[in-house]
Amino acid sequence: MKPRHKRLAIAGGVLVAVGAIATLVLNAFQSNLVFFYSPSQVVAKEVPDGRTFRLGGMVEDGSVKREGVMVSFVVTDTVQKVPVRFEGILPDLFKEGKGVVAQGKVEGGTFIAKEVLAKHDENYMPPEAAEALKRAKEGGQMQSSQAATGDPR
């Protein structure tokens, strides 16, 4: 094999290897990417089917029901509600009326959580959760004012 052909074969092999590595890295990154959604977005079906995502909002008062290690509760953004089921031990700071972020999937209208994170301080809320609650509240106020005035905008 001539040196020129040898260099060309090596360059081609390097390009194929770099392409394969880039494909594997991007695939791993995409499969580990977890998005945050509010209850209003989940109810509006803005969540991709079968994807793991984070659901954030407030635990509705009076909604926590425990059956052994199985816990069910409702997460709300003050406009919409999503029932959540979790099997495991909840964080110590998990309480009704407090902020929560759960990671899992929607199955049959219920969010099946694999992980539940409670707010660590009564004044702290993740920026994504605060923004989602604000948008949901503004959307709910707009809908109620439109219903009151009869304006279909």
UniProtKB/Swiss-Prot annotation:
Residues bound to heme are 120, 124
GO CC annotation: what is one?
plasma membrane
Extract the signal peptide range: none
Q: Keywords in UniProt for this one? A: Cell inner membrane, Cell membrane, Cytochrome c-type biogenesis, Heme, Iron, Membrane, Metal-binding, Signal-anchor, Transmembrane, Transmembrane helix
Query: Compositionally biased, Polar residues: which spans?
Result: 141-153
Molecular function GO labels:
heme binding; metal ion binding
Give the Periplasmic compartment stretches of this protein: 29-153
**UniProt keyword Cell division, yes or no:** no
List the transmembrane segments. 8-28
Q: Just give the chief location class.
A: membrane
Subcellular location per UniProt equals: Cell inner membrane
Superkingdom of source: Bacteria
Q: Which InterPro entries match?
A: CcmE, CcmE-like_sf, NA-bd_OB-fold
Q: How does it sit in the membrane?
A: Single-pass type II membrane protein
Q: Which residues lie on this side of the membrane: Cytoplasmic?
A: 1-7
Q: Which GO terms describe its biological process?
A: cytochrome complex assembly
List every stretch annotated Disordered: 130-153
Into which family does the record put it?
Answer: Belongs to the CcmE/CycJ family.
Relate the protein's function as given in its record: Heme chaperone required for the biogenesis of c-type cytochromes. Transiently binds heme delivered by CcmC and transfers the heme to apo-cytochromes in a process facilitated by CcmF and CcmH.
- The molecule here is called Cytochrome c-type biogenesis protein CcmE
